[in-house]
Amino acid sequence: MISRYKTWLVWLRRCAHSRGFGIQSPIDYEFVRYVVNEHWDYYAYSRLGKEDDWLHRKLGRLYFRITNRLQPTVVESSDYHNYIRAACRNVRFGDSSEFIIIPHERCDRASLDAIYNKVGESSVLVVEGIYESGEAKKRWRDIIADARTGVTFDLYYCGIVFFDKKRYKQHYIVNF
């Protein structure tokens, strides 16, 4: 569990990357500004995550907003089902190529190759805990460097990967 003190230090170190500053691509800026760093209370927030700790609630709300934007039919996730279903009522959970949420422990080479083989240009991958250990950091750097990935966002608590090859490969650090 990350302490509140460390949370503030992370936030201060990343404050230059707040609210999309430095992002030149209009699509990427819009994603950061209106999905990642959206601060409006959505209609479902009042009934979601009351018993969750702050990080689970923060990530759950992020996945809610991503799901609300993407409207996927199938999501691959072992957790956060309430948040995802609140954003998209008809969503199913299982093996997906649209929206995949995995913990860093499941990011071994074989798992990533399987994911890379099934994703398309509109797919989104979220890797949780990208800074939890030295090995997690290395895996995240490998994902960023992989030629099969496109635009990546480092939110400290998780990393978001897009696979659209029509866009320039970019890596953004975002104060989330």
Give residue spans per PLM region:
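A short alpha-helical cap/connector motif
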Residues: 1-121, 131-176
